[in-house]
């Protein structure tokens, strides 16, 4: 499970050093893809395989499902960390998420997310008030 918030830097070659707490789960490989709210999702190979099995069940007759799958999967990139635990974020994903040198990597349970640091701060500031006022209906049975 991915938890926490980290602040790595993107190097000049577009690489990021994985947070130490994420390395074991991602050591054998990972998949980077477009995330919602213009971040980059990071899935372990195992989690992405599970997700892909669910995605395959989406009806081909649904235009909304086809559109989502095209955007989500066309941006996917399988990567393996190097010996220094660095992963290259492909240029298209860096551009999509507006990634600059300063990043924030957050744990989001089944995945990690890579955000431009400024974009994350803006997003978090907007969401904190809503978080404090979240009703049980958003995630029934949570509290």
UniProtKB/Swiss-Prot annotation:
Localization, UniProt: Cytoplasm, Nucleoid
Any Pfam family: MraZ
**What HAMAP family does the record point to?**
MraZ (MF_01008)
List, for all copies, the residue spans of the domain called SpoVT-AbrB.
Answer: 5-47, 76-119
UniProt main location, coarse: cytoplasm
Which InterPro entries is this protein grouped with?
A: MraZ, MraZ_C, MraZ_dom, MraZ_N, MraZ_sf, SpoVT-AbrB_dom, SpoVT-AbrB_sf
Keyword annotations from UniProtKB, A to Z = Cytoplasm, DNA-binding, Repeat, Transcription, Transcription regulation
Any one cellular component term from GO for this entry? cytoplasm
Q: Which organism is it from?
A: Leifsonia xyli subsp. xyli (strain CTCB07)
Whether Cell inner membrane counts among this entry's keywords is no
CDD domains reported for this sequence: MraZ_C, MraZ_N
Membership in a protein family:
Belongs to the MraZ family.
Report the NCBIfam families cross-referenced here. Answer: division/cell wall cluster transcriptional repressor MraZ
Q: What is this protein called?
A: Transcriptional regulator MraZ
- Single Gene Ontology BP annotation: negative regulation of DNA-templated transcription initiation
What do we know about how this protein assembles, alone or with others? Answer: Forms oligomers.
Can you name one GO molecular function term for this protein? DNA-binding transcription factor activity
């Amino acid at each position: 499970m991915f938890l926490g918030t980290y602040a790595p830097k993107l190097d000049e070659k577009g690489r990021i050093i994985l947070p130490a707490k994420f390395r074991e789960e991602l050591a054998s490989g990972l998949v980077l893809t477009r995330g919602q709210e213009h971040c980059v999702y990071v899935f372990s190979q195992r989690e992405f395989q599970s997700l892909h099995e669910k995605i395959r069940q989406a009806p081909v007759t649904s235009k909304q499902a086809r559109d989502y799958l095209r955007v989500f999967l066309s941006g996917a990139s399988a990567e393996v960390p190097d010996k220094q635990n660095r992963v290259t974020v492909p240029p298209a994903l860096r551009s999509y998420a507006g990634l600059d040198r300063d990043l924030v990597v957050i744990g989001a349970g089944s995945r990690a997310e890579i955000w431009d640091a400024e974009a994350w701060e803006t997003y978090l500031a907007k969401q904190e008030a809503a978080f404090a006022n979240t009703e049980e209906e958003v995630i029934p049975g949570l509290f």
